[in-house]
Amino acid sequence: MKCANAAALLFFVLCDIGVHGGEIVAELLHSNVTVKWQTDYERQTVDFSIWFGAKTPDLLFLGFSDFGDMNSSDVLMYDNVKREIMDSYTNRDYKIIPDLSQDFQQLRRRKDHFVVRRKLTTCDSRDYAFQRGTTQFYIAASFGYRNLVDIRDKKWILDKKFGKVIEGPTDQPSTDEGVSSLERDVQLVIVNSNSPDPVPNVETTYECIIRKMPFDTVHKTYHIVRMEPYITPGNEHLVHHMEVFLCRDEVEEWSGNCNDPKKPKKSKSCSHVIAAWAMGEGPIHYPREAGLPIGGKGKNEYVMVEIHYNNPELHKGVMDTSGFQFYVTGLLRIYDAGIMELGLIYSDANSVPPNQKAWAMNGYCPSQCTQNLPEEGINIFASQMHAHLTGRKLWTSQYRDGVQIGDVNRDEHYSPHWQHLQQLRPMVRVMPGDTLVTTCVYDTRRRSNVTFGGYGITDEMCVNYIYYYPASEVEVCKSAISNSTLRAYFSQRHGMDGKTMKISDMYNGVKDWSNGVDEEFYNVLNVGNVNMNCLKSNGESFEFKSKDPRQGWENMARPRLFSGSFIRTRDRFQCPAINDMINFE
């Protein structure tokens, strides 16, 4: 494609792809509605084709939202009786109002569908700016009613879906990396429970399944070239995310609660992460030149699948045999691949005060840790970001010599209900000595208590799993605000016992985070020292290399970083969009 005017439109011009398409299907009781789109990056347009099922609605509402709010959203209305479209929006009170600027162009109308076109960004403050990352779609239909002016009206039949109108350079893999062209000797291996087990009727449960790989890993090395979830049909709403670990020791096969005292003691050796998956994601493809190595170490290889069940409605008696499936080949590829975990340490040190609109926290992977990467650097070919219910924006940036040189991955409209692996094309090259910073922005305005960092669904995480080659020894590169920084703050500012109190008790000891207390603490988080996890696959820390013997991974100064000279985001003041209106509430 041509890239004329690319500099002026850098916030959405993507010169390495021509056209991208997608599709969602809304289930609207009387009839399904299918929304297809085709994005043309050269023309900077997106064409939506809306197809009706068995019954055509009288009114159709197609809304676009960053974080799932039906108010202050961009809307396309279709009146099937008049056969007319109307560019509209919803205000704060959920009222549907025609837009002063009609930016949708109707291209075609048939009995069973219609097609419209719009610019990706119109610089209309009532229009949604389509950007890289997640777009949340609201599709509502009215059968028999036409004079509906409030989207909350019970006469609407509503469904919510997720999609990516702009894939960016993180497009899906081409078919030559798919199953159709996998090596001829590929084996499909499913690791799950041998018999159905009931999902516990508690909100958060972690179940572990340990299995021996069913092929000769004693004498031969294999490559895993694709992985994907194996979910029991009907249980998609319960399986929130999974992690897959390779075990260093030979372990007896077992399944049960991960915290069960009967869990084999040698399962502690199952610590090498080889895959991670979260609700809404598809398969993990490896590029044709790389595969994840397994076997060849003179022993049987065991894997452990850890499943996070999220059961907020406390369902009883739901049987589940979910797990993970692997595509394995004995035809080794050029490179061994690895997976690395970036972001924040799972710790109550990384906690968010209540009633915060956009609370950002940074997880550091500093140069002292990336110095352990291969001399030629690594190529990141996929990225998988993960947070829980209050996560709104997630991204990882790359710095060299303290200056930002680009992003690894970014989602400005993150949803925990639709998570996805981003295939990075072109791949991102990270060199020894680079710094990677993973940022998560949280919205806790609906919470009255502190949201702690941790494993539960109501706790928070900030993680980016990066898939890369060639493999290195670095498996975890994460940080947390140092305990000494927190203890000093809570002791000096709030008069707490900084020596004996638990970190969680200190957070809970602050009864009022308003009147500048939150702003003051936010500054502490952004300048205070950090504790680092720079870990090998066996859980051991790398040696901290410094001429100063007093320095180490504990209580270290955070990296000094500076923004690069490029602009990768739309200027919300020069080119407004409805995405920005929340800033004025």
Curated annotation (Swiss-Prot):
Top enzyme category: oxidoreductase
The reaction(s) this protein catalyses: tyramine + L-ascorbate + O2 = (R)-octopamine + L-dehydroascorbate + H2O
Gene this protein is translated from: tbh-1
E.C. designation(s): 1.14.17.-
Keywords carried by this UniProt record: Copper, Cytoplasmic vesicle, Disulfide bond, Glycoprotein, Metal-binding, Monooxygenase, Neurotransmitter biosynthesis, Oxidoreductase, Signal, Synapse
Function: Catalyzes the hydroxylation of tyramine into octopamine, a neurotransmitter involved in pharyngeal pumping and egg laying.
Domain DOMON: 31-142
PANTHER family: DOPAMINE BETA HYDROXYLASE RELATED, MOXD1 HOMOLOG 1
Co-factor requirement: Cu(2+)
Family matches, as Pfam families: Cu2_monoox_C, Cu2_monooxygen, DOMON
Organism in which the protein naturally occurs: Caenorhabditis briggsae
Binding site for Cu(2+) A: H240, H241, H308
Glycosylation sites: N32, N71, N449, N483
Positions of disulphide bridges: C208-C258, C247-C270, C365-C477, C369-C534, C440-C462
Keyword Glycoprotein: yes
Main localization category: cytoplasm
Cofactor note: Binds 2 copper ions per subunit.
UniProt keyword Ribonucleoprotein present: no
Listed SUPFAM superfamilies: PHM/PNGase F
Record's protein name: Tyramine beta-hydroxylase
InterPro entries assigned: Cu2_ascorb_mOase-like_C, Cu2_ascorb_mOase_CS-1, Cu2_ascorb_mOase_N, Cu2_ascorb_mOase_N_sf, Cu2_monoox_C, DBH-like, DOH_DOMON, DOMON_domain
